[in-house]
Amino acid sequence: MAQATGPHRRRWPTALAGLLLALLLVGCSAVAAGLNSYQSPDGRYAFLYPTGWTRVQVEGGPQVVFHDLINSDETLSLVVSEVASDKALTDLGSAVAVGENLRRRVIAPEGSGRSAELVEAREREQQGRVFYDLEYRVRLADRDRHELATAVVDRGRLYTLAASTNELRWPKVKELFERVIISFNLLV
């Protein structure tokens, strides 16, 4: 087997390193493809939302709402609630307990005409903070929906970011919604 000698032998590692760097950069850009970033005006939190979605104002509703211009029933919303300033998310209960509480009180309260099932509840840590990631199947009178949410507590506030779509579109947007939900981050 012939071996490269001279200047060709020295170019091989450089070319390989260049190729690996190019592949890495393409992979990184693909992860964020189709997403835009949003940061609160006070710089307190940030998250990613799908390209092509627009922000809408909802009077008396969530603090931030985005929806898809094409599939108007796909939404992303951030609700900020007050909790005791000395409470951590884990003080409110486990991921399952908090998920069930949200299901009963917010997603499908009695008399709403909706029913919901908590499909999955898990805890994750990000930058020293505990997050609960929650997945729901929601049944309305005329259609079924799927919802992903994440919850975190900071300085007396419970932040709940939720992405929702109809059940038929769920398989197509599942990975995108997962990236959106785990992108939620407290900055200060």
PLM features: what roles do these ranges have?
Residues 155-188:
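Surface-exposed amphipathic alpha-helical segments
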Residues 56-153, 158:
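Conserved polar/disulfide-associated segments of primarily extracytoplasmic proteins
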Residues 44, 92-100, 167, 171-175:
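Soluble non-cytosolic domains of exported or imported proteins
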Residues 29-31:
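Bacterial signal peptide processing site
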Residues 2-17:
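Bacterial N-terminal signal peptides that target proteins for export
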Residues 24-27:
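C-terminal motif of bacterial Sec signal peptides marking the signal peptidase cleavage site
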Residues 33-43, 62:
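Short, low-complexity, disordered segments immediately C-terminal to signal peptides
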Residues 42-59:
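Proline-anchored loop/turn motifs at beta-strand termini and strand-loop-strand connectors
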